[in-house]
Amino acid sequence: MRPLTPRQAEILELIKRNIADTGMPPTRAEIARRLGFKSANAAEEHLKALAKKGCIEIMPGTSRGIKLTQESTEEPDLGLPLIGQVAAGEPILAQEHVEQHYKVDPAMFRPSADFLLRVRGDSMKNIGILEGDLLAVHKIEQARNGQIVVARVEDDVTVKRFEKKGNKVFLHAENEDYSPIEVDLANQSLSIEGLAVGVIRNGDWQ
């Protein structure tokens, strides 16, 4: 299979994950919404590029007419990607953010993990999330109050406990030395990148 751009790799992974989770591929509109494209036409152009590279087949006449090729489904299992520094404005699972892969079974966690994030700082130490740990994260777009989430506030990515009150979101640390991060949704950008589903002690992987 010909090399993919970071965006193409991200779309291919989204298609695979959608088929695994729901039994069917996403629509163009769903791809556009989940990856922040302005229109379904932008998703269509990326799908055509994936088809040219032999990753998928496009089936005309249906909104879910995407079929994985045998070549794309036989890629070796590299394990869970470890996400390093996240560039401003870029999707968290973009290829350039992946430091390495760990041979971890995603099914160890409930719900299953989609990626690992290295913990920086001690703001969540009171619940056992420590500096240098690997946080297992399940990709979601919406969170419920009380959940531990990976959130992007403007261009900063943080791990905190989620609480929404009206048009404001509070991201709470689990360390009394840190004040909550208050986000006014009327004039600040907030996106949920994932749900924390487990912790791997850093020393376990040395």
UniProtKB/Swiss-Prot annotation:
It is an enzyme of class 3 (hydrolase). Its EC number is 3.4.21.88. It catalyses: Hydrolysis of Ala-|-Gly bond in repressor LexA. GO terms for biological process: DNA repair; DNA replication; negative regulation of DNA-templated transcription; proteolysis; SOS response. InterPro entries: LexA, LexA-like, LexA/Signal_pep-like_sf, LexA_DNA-bd_dom, LexA_repressor, Peptidase_S24_LexA, Peptidase_S24_S26A/B/C, WH-like_DNA-bd_sf. Keywords: Autocatalytic cleavage, DNA damage, DNA repair, DNA replication, DNA-binding, Hydrolase, Repressor, SOS response, Transcription, Transcription regulation. The active site is at S123 (for autocatalytic cleavage activity), K160 (for autocatalytic cleavage activity). Signal peptide: none annotated. The record marks A88, G89 as: Cleavage. Residues 28-48 bind DNA. One of its GO terms (molecular function) is serine-type endopeptidase activity. The keyword DNA-binding applies. The keyword Repressor applies. It holds the Pfam family Peptidase_S24. Belongs to the peptidase S24 family. Homodimer. Represses a number of genes involved in the response to DNA damage (SOS response), including recA and lexA. In the presence of single-stranded DNA, RecA interacts with LexA causing an autocatalytic cleavage which disrupts the DNA-binding part of LexA, leading to derepression of the SOS regulon and eventually DNA repair. NCBIfam families: lexA (TIGR00498). PANTHER family: LEXA REPRESSOR (PTHR33516), LEXA REPRESSOR-RELATED (PTHR33516:SF2). This is LexA repressor. It comes from Shewanella pealeana (strain ATCC 700345 / ANG-SQ1). The gene is lexA.
